[in-house]
């Protein structure tokens, strides 16, 4: 763990506890290390990596959009465990650029550290309670790391769900839920036979894992209706109208 990462982690752990009224962790990981790729929803832009890193034990390296990395910012971002990820919408040769990034990710996992990836690839301008389709990059990185290590160590992948009543409202509530993990080593023979098929199937499985960890409104046209129903019934994760007697774990379900 780099000193600046530790300092920022310590400061934010306290300040975010002041910002949020209640913070609930469901199935939190118990170890700082573990070679696990955590794939999270990306509901609240800048807030998501802060709460996932600060309120859960694992030491993580963040996959961050590449356009924030400049010759001046790169050393600072690296010191707080941030790695660039190149997307097609960034207008660069993603395959060539990401090959270098995958190599760095493999070194991170080989060092018994963890990765945090926001699998949707981007966040909505307006906070909505739904999961967009998950990209295949997280699973690709996992198998790339296993090949880098000659399959000598175990690499896991798990889903993380960030559930906010309202991410930017002070003294609102937050629940972070973690799914069971998948050991990618178990799929070695299938991967070596048909890698694309295995990557696609596991990506779908991880997507379902994340959906089960959040309040997921599958139809985007029903998100406003869902919010209105929560207000009327005083159930769910609405930040204003809710029954305080209902446990936060029950509300996000």
Describe the role of every protein-language-model region.
Residues 4-193:
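Soluble catalytic domains of membrane acyltransferases
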């Amino acid at each position: 763990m780099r000193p600046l990462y530790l300092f920022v982690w310590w400061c934010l752990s306290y300040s975010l506890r002041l910002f949020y009224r209640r913070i609930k962790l469901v199935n939190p990981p118990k170890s700082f290390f573990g070679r696990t790729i955590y794939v999270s929803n990306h509901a609240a832009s800048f807030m998501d990596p802060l709460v996932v890193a600060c309120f859960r034990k694992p030491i993580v390296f963040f996959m961050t959009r590449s356009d924030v990395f400049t010759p001046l910012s790169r050393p600072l971002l690296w010191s707080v465990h941030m790695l660039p990820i190149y997307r097609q919408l960034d207008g660069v040769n993603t395959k060539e650029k990401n090959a270098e990034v995958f190599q760095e990710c493999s070194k991170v996992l080989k060092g018994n550290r963890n990765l945090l990836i926001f699998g949707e690839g981007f966040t909505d301008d307006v906070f909505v309670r739904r999961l967009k389709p998950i990209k295949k990059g997280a699973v690709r990185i996992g198998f790339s790391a296993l090949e880098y290590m000659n399959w000598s160590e175990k690499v896991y992948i798990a889903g993380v769900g960030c559930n906010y009543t309202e991410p930017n409202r002070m003294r609102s509530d937050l629940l972070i839920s973690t799914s069971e993990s998948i050991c990618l080593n178990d799929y070695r023979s299938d991967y070596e036979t048909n890698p694309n098929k295995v990557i696609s199937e596991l990506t779908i499985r991880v997507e379902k894992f994340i959906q089960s960890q959040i309040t997921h409104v599958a139809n985007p046209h029903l998100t406003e209706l869902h919010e209105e129903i929560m207000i009327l019934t005083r159930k769910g994760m609405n930040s204003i109208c809710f029954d305080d007697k209902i446990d936060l774990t029950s509300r996000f379900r």
